[in-house]
Amino acid sequence: MRIEQELKLGFKDVLFRPKRSTLKSRSQVNLTREFTFKHSGRQWSGVPVIAANMDSVGSFAMAKALAEHGVMTAVHKHYTVADWAEFVKSADKATLNNVMVSTGTSEADFQKTKDVMALSDELIFICIDIANGYSEHLVEYVQRVRAAFPDKVISAGNVVTGDMVEELILAGADIVKVGIGPGSVCTTRVKTGVGYPQLSAIIECADAAHGLGGRIIGDGGCTCPGDVAKAFGGGADFVMLGGMLAGHEEAGGELIVKDGETFMKFYGMSSKSAMDKHSGGVAGYRAAEGKTVLLPYRGSVHGTIQDILGGVRSTCTYVGAAELRELTKRTTFIRVQEQENNVYGRE
């Protein structure tokens, strides 16, 4: 047993230090990033925010809506190949180029991924997603998927330390997904005692990935636009959002009317709700590691994504970053004990 003494930080522990800026307006800030990925050689241009691959967030409807803003969607893995075929027929190139095809690591998952990717050459992203990215099986699976899809962009995770980021990139991942337990409906840290404060995880994993020419996704922990900006400031190339995009018309969650008000069900993908729906219940050898909540129905996602991107633009103006890619270079975080004045409640 050993104890690491170095302080680890989450988004709530810091604020950006403002810096002199030549920008006159938020409209001058460019949030578009351009990446050339390490293994596939693919080039991609867009706003590097991703809707999470949860079945009450990462829907086909969400993908079409967010593509209008240049934003990506990791479509959840519970759609059938037939569902994908219908989506591919109805979606334009810009939408398909901004979609990640999510998969687990079973033999059935591999075959399904092959079937889905064969539907269109415009599907270029594969998201290999398991809760514990420290498994040797994941490394082997990444190698297998890379061999089968040499020209596709492969994301794999989730992990929170630089050593495993490096191993996954060397195995063939272009992007590594970073985050264990920070999500709004995730209870892994409570059930297992395992985790890592998300901002420190992003900072350390970004350093490891960029040294090898890889990229990272900061997955989870964002509660407001300022947190999204902090993730980018910490070095995340992409930021994945679940709870911030849940509850919207496009999210695909179950609508429930209670006492005359409309709510949408939102749950973690290791929750009892998810396992009852997709796995026939919680297996006898495991515990549920997610919660189920009812969110007030929020209408269309377009206003919310504009608010998120507007917040990030404003961050950039405060620190003098004319482009999103400059934000991490312009970032100085200060440690704080308070974030905001809550005398009239939280926004």
Curated annotation (Swiss-Prot):
<dbReference type="InterPro" id="IPR015875">
    <property type="entry name" value="IMP_DH/GMP_Rdtase_CS"/>
</dbReference>
<comment type="similarity">
    <text>Belongs to the IMPDH/GMPR family. GuaC type 1 subfamily.</text>
</comment>
<keyword id="KW-0479">Metal-binding</keyword>
<dbReference type="InterPro" id="IPR005993">
    <property type="entry name" value="GMPR"/>
</dbReference>
<dbReference type="InterPro" id="IPR001093">
    <property type="entry name" value="IMP_DH_GMPRt"/>
</dbReference>
<keyword id="KW-0560">Oxidoreductase</keyword>
<keyword id="KW-0630">Potassium</keyword>
<comment type="subunit">
    <text>Homotetramer.</text>
</comment>
<comment type="function">
    <text>Catalyzes the irreversible NADPH-dependent deamination of GMP to IMP. It functions in the conversion of nucleobase, nucleoside and nucleotide derivatives of G to A nucleotides, and in maintaining the intracellular balance of A and G nucleotides.</text>
</comment>
<feature type="binding site">
    <location>
        <begin position="216"/>
        <end position="239"/>
    </location>
    <ligand>
        <name>NADP(+)</name>
    </ligand>
</feature>
<feature type="binding site">
    <location>
        <begin position="108"/>
        <end position="131"/>
    </location>
    <ligand>
        <name>NADP(+)</name>
    </ligand>
</feature>
<dbReference type="InterPro" id="IPR013785">
    <property type="entry name" value="Aldolase_TIM"/>
</dbReference>
<dbReference type="InterPro" id="IPR050139">
    <property type="entry name" value="GMP_reductase"/>
</dbReference>
<dbReference type="GO" id="GO:0003920">
    <property type="term" value="F:GMP reductase activity"/>
</dbReference>
<dbReference type="GO" id="GO:0006163">
    <property type="term" value="P:purine nucleotide metabolic process"/>
</dbReference>
<keyword id="KW-0521">NADP</keyword>
<dbReference type="GO" id="GO:1902560">
    <property type="term" value="C:GMP reductase complex"/>
</dbReference>
<feature type="binding site">
    <location>
        <position position="181"/>
    </location>
    <ligand>
        <name>K(+)</name>
    </ligand>
</feature>
<feature type="binding site">
    <location>
        <position position="183"/>
    </location>
    <ligand>
        <name>K(+)</name>
    </ligand>
</feature>
<dbReference type="GO" id="GO:0005829">
    <property type="term" value="C:cytosol"/>
</dbReference>
<feature type="active site" description="Thioimidate intermediate">
    <location>
        <position position="186"/>
    </location>
</feature>
<dbReference type="Pfam" id="PF00478">
    <property type="entry name" value="IMPDH"/>
</dbReference>
<protein>
    <recommendedName>
        <fullName>GMP reductase</fullName>
        <ecNumber>1.7.1.7</ecNumber>
    </recommendedName>
</protein>
<dbReference type="GO" id="GO:0046872">
    <property type="term" value="F:metal ion binding"/>
</dbReference>
